[in-house]
A protein has these predicted regions:
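Structural/interface elements that position substrates and couple domains in central-metabolism enzymes
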Residues: 2-6, 21, 218
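Short gly/pro/ser/thr-enriched loop/turn and capping motifs at secondary-structure boundaries
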Residues: 104-108, 148, 176-179
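Acidic/glycine-enriched connector segments
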Residues: 81-141
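Active-site/ligand-binding-proximal alpha/beta "capping" segment
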Residues: 123-175, 219-225
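Glycine-rich beta-alpha loop segments
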Residues: 7-100
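C-terminal functional extensions of proteins
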Residues: 171-228
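Solvent-exposed alpha-helices and their adjacent loops that cap or buttress functional pockets
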Residues: 35-37, 68, 91, 111-114, ...
């Protein structure tokens, strides 16, 4: 793909970029139109590669079921693995189940547990990320890879820089996440690259009950609304 782009002239690239603006606008308009109607939701993130017999898949189902039973919808990336588990849990509880799918050359396909009227497809990661951040009342982050970390640190950065209001960010699975948090404390914090209070943005838990307790406790003192 990149080799092909090298052979294009700058004028051709400029023209293509100009037309891409309309596609980007269309994704934003369609996303805002649909997402504005879903009500309070919590986003569940994690690896697309997690298998159904994995303990974290089962935990993600239970976490999402509990979230839906507490009155929140569940938003995922719409694909397999932990994303499927998230939609599955919401579906089992009869709750709102939203999927924000991304067009990829591998891995990604819509899972069958998304509400038929709440499945959105995106070509652009950055448009999709806006939908997660704008319409989520909390981020629940299960074990995952680079994409999961991307979503996690995007939210932390936006809250830290006061571009959006604070909302719960919950890492599920202490065995998986403790090493990362130890590195953040022992390296980033020690070097003065973050402040001690920045660490308060993140909670690590191991059960579905803890997830819902944190979210409910937070919204006893905050209003449920889109983040910007």
């Amino acid at each position: 793909m990149r080799a092909e782009k090298h052979h294009k002239g700058w004028n051709e690239i400029k023209t293509n970029d100009s037309w891409a603006i309309f596609k980007i606008m269309g994704e934003f308009v369609n996303g805002f139109e649909k997402m504005s109607k879903i009500g309070p939701c919590v986003s569940v993130f994690g690896s697309a590669r997690t298998k159904e017999d994995d303990p974290y898949y089962k935990l993600a189902v239970n976490v999402s079921k509990k979230i839906a039973e507490a009155g929140y919808g569940v938003i995922t990336g719409g694909g397999p693995g932990i994303m499927e588990a998230g939609n599955r849990g919401a579906n089992l509880a009869g709750g709102t189940s939203v999927g924000l799918n991304i067009d990829l050359p591998f891995e990604q396909h819509d899972n069958p547990y998304i509400d038929s009227d709440k499945s959105l497809d995106f070509d652009y990661f950055f448009v999709r990320k806006v939908m997660f951040v704008k319409y989520s009342q909390g981020f629940v982050v299960m074990p995952g890879g680079f994409g999961t970390l991307d979503e996690l640190f995007e939210a932390i950065t936006l809250i830290q820089t006061h571009k959006i209001g604070k909302f719960p960010i919950i890492l599920v699975g202490s065995d998986f996440w403790t090493g990362l948090m130890d590195w953040i404390k022992g390296t980033m914090l020690k070097a003065g690259n973050i402040s001690p209070e920045d660490l308060n943005l993140i909670k690590i838990v191991d059960t579905e009950d803890e997830v819902v307790e944190i979210i409910d406790a937070f919204y006893k003192g905050h209003t449920l609304s889109p983040n910007f």
